[in-house]
Amino acid sequence: MARKVKIPNHIQKRLARDAHKRKRNTKSKRKYFLIVCEGEKTEPNYFESLKNDLPKGVLTSCRIDVEGTGRNTLSLVEESIKMKERLENETSLSIDKIWVVFDRDSFEPDNFNEAINLCKNSLPEIGCAWTNEAFELWYLLHFHFYNTAINREMYQKLIEGNLKPKVGEDYEYQKNSKEMYDLLKENGSLELAIRFATKLEAEFEGRFDFANHNPSTKVHHLVAELFGLEELLKKEDEDKASG
């Protein structure tokens, strides 16, 4: 069953501004979103499951492609730009928004920061759902607030610690599992994850040394945008009817 997710006000306002920009000089058409992930399975599996959980009608009005590349940081952003051009040529459709999803992991700070700045400076801007240090931080925020830097192995142990009491003591975290979105939906809280990610973001407000924002994630902006599409589409329909 499709779900409703409460979107924080500051994200709703940003989405409304973006929708207003897109509306100008734009004919009515099916919107096209491209999500390009660093991982070939972990992140694509999560977002494919999330996509199927969006409110009824969103996928009728929006095409959402999720691609896993095996690339990282700067090379991922560069590949997403090439992928957009290639898909637009192949489909004769215009992609409205690109999002890239990648982790800090052990990559060079300069490459990580440069990738984020390239997204910000692109025209149109590329959405950047980065996480420092690993995507699994987003999973953990469905249960508790974490603001201490930890390694990937500890993420795995904490995920298992949060899920074992709910699904059974024999549970073992599988990095590329197709069930992760559903496990989090049934046993955690997406609204809590968005709230905690926003709280982490505020701890680094005004700082642009992104490689040192540990722990932190921007995944909630992408998730909120996807779940906010239903209201934005309704608003655009109302604007067309009144205009």
What are these regions (language model features)?
Residues 1-32, 42-44, 48-67, 85-99, ...:
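C-terminal accessory helical subdomains adjacent to catalytic cores in phosphodiester-
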Residues 34-38:
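Short hydrophobic beta-strand that contains or immediately precedes a catalytic carboxylate
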Residues 69-79:
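Short phosphate-binding loop-to-helix
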